[in-house]
Design a protein with these regions (language model features):
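Nucleotide-sugar-dependent
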Residues: 170-173, 232-272, 278-287
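N-terminal pre-catalytic "stem/leader" segment of glycosyltransferase-like enzymes
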Residues: 1-54
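A charged, aromatic-enriched C-terminal amphipathic alpha-helix characteristic of glycosyltransferases
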Residues: 22, 303, 313-347
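Donor nucleotide-sugar binding/catalytic pocket of nucleotide-sugar-dependent glycosyltransferases
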Residues: 112-150, 158
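Conserved catalytic-core segment of nucleotide-activated headgroup transferases in glycan assembly
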Residues: 7-27, 140-151, 155-241
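Active-site proximal beta-strand in glycosyltransferases
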Residues: 61-91
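Membrane-proximal helix-turn-helix segments that form the acceptor-binding/catalytic region
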Residues: 76, 89-117
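Conserved acidic donor-binding segment of nucleotide-sugar-dependent glycosyltransferases
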Residues: 291-302, 310-316
């Protein structure tokens, strides 16, 4: 493939969001392509994100193919009311021009008009294919996260039962679903819960209704809220916190389609950090846990509690679970695999 000049409508103006740097920018830098955000410049191809103005004339330029990088399940909204409100808010904020309509309809129509659509899980792919058969599943690159070979026999960790949660605050409310097993766990183990995330966030469209993360966690975790720490997300803080922890957890609210259809990225990151990880039974987590041969999926409160105790009480089991996860990474989530998938996606759109 020749070196491309790629026009990109990004998720963040700074290009620093994880969805920018771990996806298109990762591939473009590795392959030597140029990415510009001024779409009026001469480009070979345009990549659109969910924050694009889908009705912009810039996407209708002759002989310039458009690739839609759709990493979340916007085709499966929470409710018709929420879907319309999202579309209306994006119109009123100036993000999307044209007529007001539910956001999922904007996404559907843009899938139909794009030369290729990228997504991040096979579950999302099945939802997109009715609107675009040229769909490619590509997970995020995690090269920015260190691959840690952790010792579970470290004497400094013997009396410390620290548990890690990592991610964006938009998914943090899932922790209230396991407040009961965490409370019961705290009565038998001296635990501490570390949340590596943003200290503040906007509840709607990343720009409206600012919330304090620690306040939400203290409310959701009730009587064990004194066991909570919020650590600002940086690569360094994440790696350092992981070194102090014995387990990671990813509880999610499966009643919210956007959460239920999230890909396996966060589980893979926890394995990369050298931690066994317990997860809610989402389609992606269930699929990957089965493929990796780990006992990670927790169907109910009793299972969460039992699995927490097993990992904390049995370092040998925790080590084996982590090694299975890391072996899965070595076989299924390498830099060369990801780059090849990006190559094929662009080649399919440039034909």
């Amino acid at each position: 493939m020749k070196k491309l000049r790629i026009g990109y409508w990004p998720l963040s103006a700074s290009l620093k969001s994880a969805g920018d740097r771990r996806r298109l920018l990762f591939w473009a830098e590795a392959r030597g392509h140029t990415v510009v955000t001024n779409l009026s410049q001469k480009v070979d191809v345009i990549v659109a994100s969910e924050n694009s103005d889908f009705n912009s004339n810039l996407f209708s330029q002759k002989n310039i193919p458009v690739i839609f990088d759709l990493v979340d399940a916007y085709l499966s909204p929470l409710s018709p009311t929420d879907d319309f409100a999202r579309g209306l808010a994006k119109k009123l904020s100036g993000q999307i021009s044209g007529h007001v309509k539910p956001f999922s309809q904007h996404v559907r129509d843009f899938c139909l008009s794009s030369k290729a659509v990228l997504c991040s899980s096979i579950e999302q792919e099945e939802m997109i294919k009715p609107y675009n058969l040229n769909t490619h599943v590509i997970l995020d690159s995690h090269d920015e996260i260190p691959f840690i070979n952790k010792s579970f026999d470290n004497p400094s960790l013997v009396n410390e039962n620290q548990i890690l949660w990592e991610g964006q605050p938009a998914t943090i409310r899932g922790v209230h679903l396991i407040s009961l097993p965490l409370t019961r766990l705290s009565k038998s183990h001296d635990v501490h819960l570390n949340f590596v995330t943003d200290e503040k966030f906007f509840q709607f469209l990343n720009r409206y209704i600012q919330r304090n993360t620690i306040g939400l966690l203290k409310k959701d975790l009730g009587q064990i809220n004194s066991l909570v720490s919020v650590i600002p997300w940086t690569q360094e803080n994440l790696a350092a916190t992981a070194q102090r922890c014995k387990i990671a957890m990813i509880p999610i609210d499966l009643s919210v389609p956007m959460q239920r259809l999230k890909p396996e990225n966060r589980l893979l990151i926890m394995w990369r950090l050298g931690l066994p990880c317990l997860v809610s039974p989402s389609p992606a987590y269930t699929r990957v846990a089965h493929e990796a041969g780990v006992n990670a999926v927790c169907e109910d409160s009793d299972t969460w509690l039992r699995n927490f105790r097993e990992l904390l009480n049995n370092p040998s089991f925790a080590r084996d679970e982590t090694l299975r996860g890391q072996n899965y990474l070595r076989e299924n989530h390498t830099k060369s695999i990801l780059l090849s998938k990006w190559d094929k996606a662009f080649e399919s759109a440039m034909d």
